[in-house]
């Protein structure tokens, strides 16, 4: 049936420990997913734009440490890049030459919306071509989930391609989420 043909195991004594690589030491790890959540209107997008500005300029983090300058890629299903995100980034002092917005997918002369379930490989190729991507922001992170966002298994399945992309590119993945009523 639908059983795995072989499960791979590794003994703990055979694991070679690797240090965590940090974008912002102690806060944003390279190749890992991070979630910034809060009630609507509490500044989540503003915080993420400030983080993006710090990365693009090689600026200082709130704790005074300096960021290594790099590129930032943003996929937003809620805010428009022209009237909201780019202006907020500019106000945050971002180097807009280092910011890239995922807009759509071209298939020949046709365009369609970006679909994480089927477009990770074209996105990975684009990120490799850009080079130096240190931060990938997805707002809201639930937009990467094609199934029921209230079912843990479907959420994990939907997010896994982004998590894998982040790990392979060694960039931090920052997902923005809104608390539902009664959970804040």
Model-based region annotation:
Residues 35-36, 41, 46, 73-75, ...:
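Phosphate-binding/switch region of NTP-binding enzymes
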Residues 19, 24-25, 40, 60, ...:
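Conserved inter-motif catalytic segment of the P-loop NTP-binding fold
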Residues 30-34, 70-71:
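Pre-Walker A (Motif I) flank of P-loop NTPase domains
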Residues 47, 51:
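Hydrophobic positions on the alpha1 helix immediately C-terminal to the Walker A/P-loop
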Residues 1-23:
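N-terminal pre-Walker A segment at the start of P-loop NTPase domains
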Residues 56:
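Gly/Ala-rich phosphate-binding loop of Rossmann-like dinucleotide-binding domains
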Residues 30, 129-130, 168:
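Alpha-helix termination/capping residues and helix-transition junctions
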């Amino acid at each position: 049936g639908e059983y795995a043909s072989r499960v791979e195991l590794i003994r703990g004594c055979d694991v070679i420990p690797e240090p965590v690589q940090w974008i912002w030491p102690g806060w944003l790890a390279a190749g890992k997913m991070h979630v910034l959540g809060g009630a609507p209107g509490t500044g989540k997008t503003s915080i993420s734009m400030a983080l993006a500005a710090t990365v693009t300029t090689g600026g200082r983090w709130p704790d005074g440490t300096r960021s290594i300058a790099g590129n930032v890629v943003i996929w937003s299903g809620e805010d428009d890049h022209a009237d909201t995100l780019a202006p907020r980034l500019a106000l945050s002092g971002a180097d807009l030459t280092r910011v890239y917005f995922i807009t759509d997918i071209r298939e020949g002369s046709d365009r369609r919306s970006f679909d994480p379930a089927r477009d990770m490989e074209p996105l990975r190729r684009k990120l490799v071509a850009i080079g130096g991507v240190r931060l990938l922001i997805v707002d809201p992170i639930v937009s990467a989930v094609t199934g029921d966002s209230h079912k843990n298994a479907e959420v994990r399945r939907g997010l896994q391609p982004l998590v894998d992309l982040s790990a392979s590119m060694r960039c931090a993945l920052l997902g923005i989420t809104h608390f539902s009523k009664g959970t804040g």
